[in-house]
């Protein structure tokens, strides 16, 4: 009879990366602690943190606290009863973006189902503060589904991010097991309404694979996203954060990810990043529209 350890799939070589903890990375981590800020890069144990913080000048801040009101079975973020909102957080995030000299910033948040506005007002204020202090930094937001609250979504989109990112995470069949407090159709509705509110802002979603889905289900999910006018797709390998989380059912090869990307582009996505270590914010600075890219170029000119 197989033991628990034998049941866990062996991680393939292409998922083994060398961590480069340089002075830049160490300094940024120290600054985050001094300012009492959180990044999903750290909380979700992202394998790309060194590349993003160092070479690409991108980072993903996690606001509204460090405790999520949901307990999705794939996610490493702490769950439980959150603290009160920190109304000074928007200014601290904006200041940190400036000190880090970021080219592109992703602002995500824990789900705050305990709040009447789902945290949308502080979220929108964070976008505005970052924009005020960093006019050449492109901003991507990665919110929860806001409990399906349309007014909360309106508040978010009125802050005019450069990208709206909301993750489908997995295929329809697996959604109840993977993220019980969310629904597949509510995610699609959230993405569609975002585009209706601000048609010129690109929308984006991300899919984890390796949870037991079929290739046909992956392609059906692509079709559902395109039917709701989603522009950008990222696809990455699910990695089990701990023994308490869902186990990996399959490790996809780089060749299989290449095929997924090819199919996604054929289905009409403007951008698709697909690979074993791809995460929702991976190479996000490349995915903004032309107007936002011009803003990035102006910022580069000021640095030189």
Swiss-Prot record:
<keyword id="KW-0808">Transferase</keyword>
<comment type="similarity">
    <text>Belongs to the radical SAM superfamily. Lipoyl synthase family.</text>
</comment>
<protein>
    <recommendedName>
        <fullName>Lipoyl synthase</fullName>
        <ecNumber>2.8.1.8</ecNumber>
    </recommendedName>
</protein>
<dbReference type="InterPro" id="IPR007197">
    <property type="entry name" value="rSAM"/>
</dbReference>
<feature type="region of interest" description="Disordered">
    <location>
        <begin position="282"/>
        <end position="304"/>
    </location>
</feature>
<dbReference type="GO" id="GO:0046872">
    <property type="term" value="F:metal ion binding"/>
</dbReference>
<feature type="binding site">
    <location>
        <position position="41"/>
    </location>
    <ligand>
        <name>[4Fe-4S] cluster 1</name>
    </ligand>
</feature>
<dbReference type="Pfam" id="PF04055">
    <property type="entry name" value="Radical_SAM"/>
</dbReference>
<keyword id="KW-0411">Iron-sulfur</keyword>
<feature type="binding site">
    <location>
        <position position="68"/>
    </location>
    <ligand>
        <name>[4Fe-4S] cluster 2</name>
    </ligand>
</feature>
<feature type="binding site">
    <location>
        <position position="52"/>
    </location>
    <ligand>
        <name>[4Fe-4S] cluster 1</name>
    </ligand>
</feature>
<keyword id="KW-0479">Metal-binding</keyword>
<keyword id="KW-0949">S-adenosyl-L-methionine</keyword>
<dbReference type="GO" id="GO:0005737">
    <property type="term" value="C:cytoplasm"/>
</dbReference>
<feature type="binding site">
    <location>
        <position position="281"/>
    </location>
    <ligand>
        <name>[4Fe-4S] cluster 1</name>
    </ligand>
</feature>
<feature type="binding site">
    <location>
        <position position="46"/>
    </location>
    <ligand>
        <name>[4Fe-4S] cluster 1</name>
    </ligand>
</feature>
<feature type="binding site">
    <location>
        <position position="72"/>
    </location>
    <ligand>
        <name>[4Fe-4S] cluster 2</name>
    </ligand>
</feature>
<dbReference type="InterPro" id="IPR006638">
    <property type="entry name" value="Elp3/MiaA/NifB-like_rSAM"/>
</dbReference>
<keyword id="KW-0004">4Fe-4S</keyword>
<feature type="domain" description="Radical SAM core">
    <location>
        <begin position="54"/>
        <end position="270"/>
    </location>
</feature>
<dbReference type="InterPro" id="IPR031691">
    <property type="entry name" value="LIAS_N"/>
</dbReference>
<comment type="pathway">
    <text>Protein modification; protein lipoylation via endogenous pathway; protein N(6)-(lipoyl)lysine from octanoyl-[acyl-carrier-protein].</text>
</comment>
<dbReference type="InterPro" id="IPR003698">
    <property type="entry name" value="Lipoyl_synth"/>
</dbReference>
<dbReference type="InterPro" id="IPR013785">
    <property type="entry name" value="Aldolase_TIM"/>
</dbReference>
<dbReference type="GO" id="GO:0051539">
    <property type="term" value="F:4 iron, 4 sulfur cluster binding"/>
</dbReference>
<dbReference type="Pfam" id="PF16881">
    <property type="entry name" value="LIAS_N"/>
</dbReference>
<dbReference type="GO" id="GO:0016992">
    <property type="term" value="F:lipoate synthase activity"/>
</dbReference>
<keyword id="KW-0963">Cytoplasm</keyword>
<keyword id="KW-0408">Iron</keyword>
<feature type="binding site">
    <location>
        <position position="75"/>
    </location>
    <ligand>
        <name>[4Fe-4S] cluster 2</name>
    </ligand>
</feature>
């Amino acid at each position: 009879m197989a033991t628990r350890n034998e049941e866990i799939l062996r991680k393939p070589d292409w998922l083994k990366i060398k961590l480069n903890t340089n002075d830049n990375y160490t300094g940024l981590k120290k600054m985050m602690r001094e300012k009492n800020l959180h990044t999903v890069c750290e909380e979700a144990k992202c394998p790309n943190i060194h590349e993003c913080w160092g070479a690409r000048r991108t980072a993903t801040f996690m606001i509204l606290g460090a405790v999520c009101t949901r307990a999705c079975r794939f996610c490493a973020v702490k769950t439980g009863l959150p603290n009160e909102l920190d109304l000074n957080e928007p200014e601290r995030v904006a200041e940190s973006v400036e000190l880090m000299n970021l080219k592109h910033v992703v602002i995500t948040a824990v789900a705050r189902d305990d709040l009447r506005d789902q945290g949308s007002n502080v979220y929108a204020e964070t976008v505005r503060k970052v924009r005020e202090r960093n006019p050449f930094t492109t901003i991507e937001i990665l919110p929860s589904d806001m409990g399906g609250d349309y007014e909360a979504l309106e508040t978010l989109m009125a802050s005019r991010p450069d990208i709206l990112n909301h993750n489908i995470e997995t295929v329809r069949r697996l959604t109840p097991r993977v993220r019980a407090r969310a629904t597949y159709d509510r995610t699609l509705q959230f993405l569609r309404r975002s585009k209706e509110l601000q048609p010129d802002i690109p929308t984006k979603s991300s899919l984890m694979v390796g949870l037991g889905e079929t290739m046909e289900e992956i392609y059906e999910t692509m079709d559902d996203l395109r039917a709701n006018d989603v522009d950008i797709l990222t696809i990455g390998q699910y990695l089990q954060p701990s023994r308490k989380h869902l186990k990996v059912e399959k490790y996809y090869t780089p060749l299989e990810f290449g095929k997924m990307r090819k199919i996604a582009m054929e289905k009409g996505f403007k951008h698709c990043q697909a690979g074993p270590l791809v995460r929702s914010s991976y190479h996000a600075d490349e995915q903004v529209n032309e107007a936002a890219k011009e803003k990035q170029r102006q910022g580069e000119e000021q640095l030189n």
